[in-house]
Amino acid sequence: MRLPGRRRPLRWSVVTSAPGGAAGDQWGDTWFARDLVSALKSQGQQARVVSRGGAESEARDADDVVLVLRGLRKVTPRPGPTTWLLWVISHPELVHADEAASYDLVFAASSNWSRSAELGAIPLLQATNPDRFSQNAGAPDSGEPILFVGSTRGEYRPIVRDAIACGAEPSIYGVGWEAYLPVERIRAEFLPNDELPAAYASAGVVLNDHWPDMAAEGFLSNRLFDAAATGARIVSDPAIGLGEVFGDVVRTYRAPGELCEILGGDPADAFPDRAARLGLASRIAQEHGFAARARELIAQAEQVRRS
């Protein structure tokens, strides 16, 4: 029984670009969607994750809200009373004006996207789950001295290349690295997502990078939010807006020599101290947790449906 004055829970489908089944478990988008769905449910909503195969299914007609996490695949909203929301979390260059116009609302994981005004996009940055990614996820400095988690994306990713050129020995988890590195440098092709919080929290340093176009448009990587929430030391390539969110706690480098200086010294000297990192972790958990994103999405969806 609903309490008087309380709004009816909305039925949500959160659509990802990932395939269904076990294959989808290896996609970060799947875990992102699961954490968001949990946050929506915790705020009284009905929600489920939908893989790319069900994105345009007739089953979406039974939803109140469909939220599409836009990655590599375009999803065309179905006509009808369902409210369709688009959240551009990666590859913003693929989103065209006609696609954006087909949605009731568009969100972008950047506060600095040059096309936000053109497309009517509302800034909504990436997020983390502080129940999983927390300072208690692992003992500091008990894991990999230098850690990188990510596939090659078909290239020798610059931050890994630069780190190795400095003489550093990063521990690599990801697909495709055998084309660039000797096999002994590769820990595994896949690090299970439920092991990721401990890996970040226990690492000496976590390496982060962005696609160049995403860095230029301020689409900050999800890895930054997850790793920062654990209190990890992080070094990243520069990205527009990174300092606005993470301050000077996340170190950035513009030239290989700068990275060599950061990785070659004592981490205690090269990075802010643990108190500063935990201060950032607390702020990220509060301001950039999935609970905050769910509240914003619910408020926006309800407003659209009232209008």
Residue ranges and their predicted role:
Residues 193-194, 206-225, 229, 236-239, ...:
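Nucleotide-sugar-dependent
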Residues 58-60, 98-99, 198-199:
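Structural alpha-helical scaffold elements that stabilize or flank donor/cofactor-binding regions
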Residues 264-282:
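Conserved donor-nucleotide binding/catalytic region of nucleotide-linked donor-dependent transferases
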Residues 96, 193-196, 224, 259:
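Acidic, amphipathic alpha-helical patches
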Residues 1-83, 114-115, 237, 242, ...:
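N-terminal pre-catalytic "stem/leader" segment of glycosyltransferase-like enzymes
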